[in-house]
Design a protein with these regions (language model features):
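Catalytic alpha/beta core domains of metabolic enzymes, predominantly
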Residues: 1-119
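Terminal or standalone catalytic/regulatory effector modules within metabolic enzymes
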Residues: 119-147
Length: 147
């Protein structure tokens, strides 16, 4: 329809709704998959999302980790832009490419790698567990990091 109306792909932003992992865990994977498909649907288009929606309803201390890991996952899936809380410095660092090791760890888990959890720092273990959670490989509970 866009082409019929003379609207070029590069003028279009896709903005799928990001639903909370706390209540719509399966929809988190749906948004990730949609981001992967945008490039096939309209190669020159752009994508955007309200990133922090993914952590709505989670305890405040866990929201930054959920947001940061989901950003890494969506970046891998082709995300072009995101509405984020600029006060979350680690999230901003991730977006600007200053958390490269964490980004690579998320991507390796997305690729199916099973890291040696005993050899990882606690922060890296939390990233692995959160990636698996957002991929739907474990069920959400406020205590997912303790399992």
């Amino acid at each position: 329809k866009m082409a019929e109306q003379g609207i070029e792909d590069e003028r279009v932003f896709y903005d799928p709704i990001v639903l909370p992992v706390t209540s719509q865990q399966d929809q988190v994977q749906g948004c990730t998959l949609f981001m992967q498909m945008v490039g096939d649907l309209a190669p020159e288009s752009k994508s955007n999302c309200g990133l922090s929606n993914v952590s709505n309803g989670a305890p405040e201390e866990l929201r930054p980790l959920l947001n940061r890991v989901y950003l890494a996952m969506l970046m891998r899936s082709g995300l072009g832009a995101a509405i984020v809380n600029h006060a979350e410095t680690e999230l901003v660092d991730m977006a600007r490419g200053r958390r490269d090791e964490e980004l690579k760890l998320v991507h390796r888990v997305m690729d199916g790698e099973e890291p040696d959890m005993g050899a990882l720092s606690q922060e890296a273990v939390d990233v692995v567990k959160t990636t698996r959670l957002l991929m739907g490989q474990s069920l959400y509970s406020h205590s997912w990091l303790k399992l």
